[in-house]
A protein has these predicted regions:
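Beta-rich carbohydrate-recognition modules and glycan-binding surfaces
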Residues: 16-180
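Positively charged, low-complexity intrinsically disordered regions
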Residues: 4, 15-16
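Sec-dependent signal peptide recognition
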Residues: 1-9
Length: 180
């Protein structure tokens, strides 16, 4: 019985405490898990696409497109839903990216982001070489005062990579996404 309790503890309670969770490596049918979304859903004119590649030992998603501010637009994104509960001990998201030396964002939606324009966001630069960006959850800013000031990791419902907020050409490759 004691052994059974220890196993339950290790499997269910300890998950996420100091351990890395591979959220995505773009190997197993990523096209079935990731969704491309643009501001066209709200009348904008930004346009783009996501494609999946394998290069040497890396499988990755490539998001490309044109971000336009016309018609109150200004974003393209790829988003993946989380269909499991994260540990409240999660503190950070680590992503491996390369791109066109532009600023991009990670957007997190939670069970509290009910309206389509609600999210938490944190910026990063995608240089032209593969680099790992480590973004702490405390660095994410809420999109409005109606959201909680801090993200509760247990409430995270999706993670998105976003080209946002200014007119530019988006070109970003995303390899691994790790939550820890």
């Amino acid at each position: 019985m004691f052994r059974f309790i220890i196993i339950l503890y290790l499997v269910f309670i300890k998950q996420g405490i100091g351990e890395e969770i591979l959220f995505e490596n773009f190997i197993n049918n990523p096209q079935e898990k990731w969704e491309f979304i643009s501001d066209q859903v709200m009348g904008g004119v930004s346009d783009g696409k996501v494609e999946y590649f394998k290069e040497d030992d890396k499988s990755y998603a490539r998001m490309t497109g044109i971000v336009s501010l016309e018609n109150n637009g200004g974003f393209i994104q790829i988003r993946k839903k989380i269909d499991f509960s994260l540990s409240k001990e999660i503190k950070s998201i680590k992503i491996q990216v390369r791109g066109n030396n532009q600023e991009y964002f990670i957007h997190i939606r939670t069970s509290g982001t009910i309206l389509p324009w609600q999210y938490y966001q944190a910026p990063f630069i995608a240089s032209d070489k593969w680099e790992t960006q480590d973004i702490k959850l405390i660095e994410f800013k809420r999109s409005g005062i109606m959201l909680a000031k801090k993200i509760n990791p247990k409430n995270i419902k999706s993670i998105a990579i976003v080209a946002y907020g200014k007119e530019h050409e988006a070109f970003i490759d995303v390899n691994n996404i790790i939550i820890y």
